[in-house]
Amino acid sequence: MTIQRFLKEYGLFGSILLGIVAYRPLSVLSPMIPYVLMTMLFFTFSRIAPRDIRPRPIHLTLIVTQIVLALGGYFLVRYLPVPYAEIYAQAVLMCFLCPVAAAAPVIVGLLGGSIAIVTSYVVLNCLSIIITGPLILGWLGHPQGTLLESMTHVLVGVLPIVMIPLLTAFGIRWKLPSVHARVRSLSSASLYIWIFLLSLVIANTVHFVAKERQGVATMIIVLVLIGLVTCIIQYSIGKAMSRKVLGESVTIGQALGQKNSSISIWMIQSYLNPIASVSQAAYSIFQNIFNALQVIHHDRRQVLEQRIRHKERN
């Protein structure tokens, strides 16, 4: 077994377990997350060409789907005759409305999907959330700042993390082709960085949940379940759309299912009941577990296919 395969098999879940068990010391390193993420994205973006980054019809479909799920889910839950219905509705709203994670292109690359389509969507989705997010939350929630302040926060929180490594990778591709070729040859770099980053993200999420001590146990359990159910719904819809449009289940599945929890939690804290952010924290844990399972399954399938091809040649 190669080191890369060993890390895919055991390193990912080991990283998740480490983040849960050692969340206190690791959460101190949370300021490193944006910089580690940008480094990981740089290696991923070195594998695509500038001409591949462009809007596509599927991007508009994804944005509309996201908004419909968010508003439909909110109003469906808001008027249920149960205690804390408004808090649950806010949690559902944000689990659907949350922008796509900047790390989505990395996972798509590890799973053999289209990095270009997801990278384009990360940028377009960020721009759409800058406009629609504050408007929707200002309508349904209780804003603590101006519309311009909210739009600026989302812009500063997401766009540089994607654009800096993207432009750096394209610049090196153009000016330093030999360096670019060397960077492209480091195909395992994104995996190694993701294993480290995953432990920090999980630790930061668990630390956040541990601090949220308000609310009864039943409410917390329901909020966690909301994170799980909305995660399943979005990955399922995304994968079904991806099979129909692209003939594979990875690309659109990650675009719709993998979320930027830090931005979502901030938006909840700014507009809605803060306890609703427990669902988004739970969503982050579930999506990372699912991503790890996908990478392991993809790696095992590749190994099996290689063995079959080897037998056929012999």
Regions picked out by a protein language model, each given a short descriptive name:
Residues 1-314:
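Alpha-helical transmembrane segments of multi-pass small-molecule/ion transporters
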